[in-house]
Amino acid sequence: GFPLGVSTMSSTSLEEVLDQSDGNAWFQLYAGESDALTQGLVSRAAQAGYRTLILTADVPALAPRRRDQHNGFTVPFRLKPKQLIDFCLHPRWSLTTLMRGIPKPRNISVQEGREPSSSETGFRREAGRGRFDWRFLSQLRSQWPHQLVLKGVMSPEDAKMAVTAGVEAVYVSNHGGRQL
């Protein structure tokens, strides 16, 4: 079957998703703002049993997200009149979310066994941007013993360099074109 791609920003922990996928999941890594955070995520993925890691390199800089701006979406979330109207127009979703709690990224907490803090749930969108380079990929390759995929390759030259650096596959992507 097809593997599940599990994002660093997933609202379900990488361990839980792997359990539910019968072991057929790949972990998609966004480089964190610190090496410790990134290495912790890589170690957790390996310990959980992931056999494929996707390093996401197709968002080196953030572009304005016009749709999010138009809809009043902010991180961290702030309640505004437009959102209040949306909640009233979608009562089932609103009540379910209230009962279950606001979805939070479950993979970015560095300490096991605690809820992500409010700053972590906001996950600074600029964190880790521009940190990726070939040295970073080389270090990751030496840390990760299984299949490594580089996501965000846009040129034949970069694809060749990625293979030389030890990745098993390249994933041609511009992140939906919204980061251009």
Provide a role label for each language-model segment.
Residues 1-164, 168-169, 176-179:
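Active-site entrance/lid segments in N-terminal catalytic domains of soluble metabolic enzymes
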